[in-house]
From Swiss-Prot:
It comes from the Eukaryota. Homodimer. Heterodimer with PEX11G. Probably interacts with COPB2 and COPA. Interacts with PEX19. Interacts with FIS1. The gene is Pex11a. Strongly expressed in liver and at lower levels in heart, brain, kidney and testis. Residues 115-217 are lumenal. Induction: By ciprofibrate. This is Peroxisomal membrane protein 11A. GO terms for biological process: brown fat cell differentiation; peroxisome fission; peroxisome membrane biogenesis; peroxisome organization; regulation of peroxisome size; signal transduction.
């Protein structure tokens, strides 16, 4: 209950709750729309999804300023690669939220003469760039973690009296097994990096579908959005799980 109250008291937490509900409705709608006796349920889910999506717009109006603040913070990162990736990513996020705000103003009748399709493409494109750059940053962090795990393993093997086991029969697959083991151990020892990677990977399915780069069905987009929203909620409930800039 305390965790729920903490989430509800934060605008980002409320937005992620609404987003999780929206994508859960999308996923359920995809699973039920092929069933002949579920038309009424599907219609209710669609109405709820639309209502939640409209409600989210109010929480997202202040996200432009939050993205600007995140850009200022990313410029101060000590490591060059994360600083470059995060700064460019957050600049694209600022543009995305500006486009999203214009679309919201158009939907409520505050502006006229706005080409909805053009602004939607711009929003999807900059959202895609933001997520792509965020994933590049995640990949950089993963490679650093894998290097650290490999060095730690080498130290243990050097101090051990037993030499590492080697089999010629497994030579062809040894590199793949070693890589996957390093990847697993690296993400296991760094949960914030795992959460951020999963969240960004699931999120990027949305602009990929909108831009026609990789077409997905409603179920895939809904499932990806739901997983991403739940991962985001975890970082709100447990701030220590949020990936920090170096």
């Amino acid at each position: 209950m305390d965790a729920f109250i903490r989430v509800a008291n934060q605008s980002q937490g409320r937005d992620r709750l609404f987003r999780a509900t929206q994508h859960a409705c999308m996923l359920l709608r995809y699973l039920l729309e092929s069933k002949a006796d579920k038309e009424a349920v599907v219609l209710k889910l669609k109405r709820l999804e639309t209502s939640v999506s409209t409600g989210r717009k109010w929480f997202r109006l202040g996200n432009v300023f939050h993205a600007i603040q995140a850009t200022e913070q990313s410029i101060q990162a000590a490591d060059l690669a994360p600083r470059l990736c995060l700064t460019l990513a957050n600049l694209n996020r600022v543009v995305y939220y500006i486009c999203d705000t214009v679309l919201w103003a158009k939907s409520v009748g505050l502006t006229s003469g706005v080409n909805r399709e053009k602004w939607q493409r711009w929003a999807a494109r900059h959202y895609y760039y933001f997520l792509l750059l965020s994933l590049v940053r995640d990949l950089y962090e993963i490679l650093l973690q894998m290097g650290q795990v490999a060095r730690d393993r080498a130290k243990r093997e050097k101090s051990s009296r037993d030499p590492p086991k080697y089999s010629v029969a497994n030579e062809e697959t040894e590199w793949l097994q070693s890589f996957l083991l390093l990847l697993f151990q690296s993400l296991k020892r760094h949960p914030p990096l795992l959460l951020d990677t999963v969240k960004n990977f699931c999120d990027i399915l949305i602009p990929l579908n909108q831009l026609g780069i990789y077409k997905s069905n409603l179920g895939v987009v809904g499932l990806g959005g739901l997983i991403s929203s739940l991962a985001g909620l975890l970082t709100v409930v447990y701030p220590q799980l949020k990936l920090k800039a170096r």
